[in-house]
């Protein structure tokens, strides 16, 4: 009996270690964020040269020359994850959730204070109340690019 107790304990520790969550399989928590709108993102003809994600290695202008060429237009805007020009986060897809509404937005510009998205996207997020609300507290997390249809 004395010999089986240490073996049982070793077996318990090994199985516990194998069942422990790893960073790869842990669920990411949504991050609180302020979301506002800017009608300039609703203009399909605006050149991508007018935003932080214009050119450079991570630029989007060669892929999408205008806002309207971004798949999922007008669910686009600035993101707090883009500090400025040529960010590696240019073109990433983000899930925004406000109350029971969820939208997916392609990041094309810098927005240090939170997400700043097209008015029509904000209307989708807030049930048509973008102008009335102006700014809302929501949550965000990076999403699979297929949700934004960006292919990034």
UniProtKB/Swiss-Prot annotation:
Superkingdom of source: Eukaryota
One GO CC annotation: extracellular region
Pfam family, one: Cerato-platanin
Subcellular location: Secreted
Keywords associated with the record: Allergen, Disulfide bond, Secreted, Signal
Signal sequence, renumbered to the chain: 1-19
Cystine crosslinks: 53-90, 93-148
Family from the record: Belongs to the cerato-platanin family.
Name of the protein: Allergen Asp f 15
